[in-house]
Amino acid sequence: MGMGGSGRQSLTKLATFIANYELFQIEVNKTYSMENWKNDLKKVLKRAGADGKKIVFLFTDLQIKDESFLEDVSMILTTGEVPNLFAADEKAEILDRVQHTAREEGRELGETSFANLYNIFMTNVKSNLHIVLAMSPVGTRSVTLTIYKHSF
């Protein structure tokens, strides 16, 4: 939280670089849709959870085109996932990637059931994905952000 120009994004980018993490930001334009949002979420969750990449997701108040964007971010922060984001075939692909990544890193997976592999995916998301909300306390979204802030 801070006024525009106070360096929230610059400091986040610097810290991301120093920590050797990947920076992920969405690129919102006039045609950015809910489908684009869901695809971006899938991409970042797969990178963090299936590929085991350390990622900082920098999300600003100017990128909120729909209130459901905040709801999805809230779900990721509280549970590590967005319900019904992935179709069954996408989940199968994710679990294959989890197995592949674990083998490359020389980790023991133990039981390779769907539930166990999905738990590994969720654990990876929770430990590898860091979400930074760069918000301004002033402007049209301040009421929404105040309500959102108090929900935690």
What are the language-model segments listed below?
Residues 1-152:
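Conformational switch/transducer regions in large eukaryotic molecular machines and scaffolds
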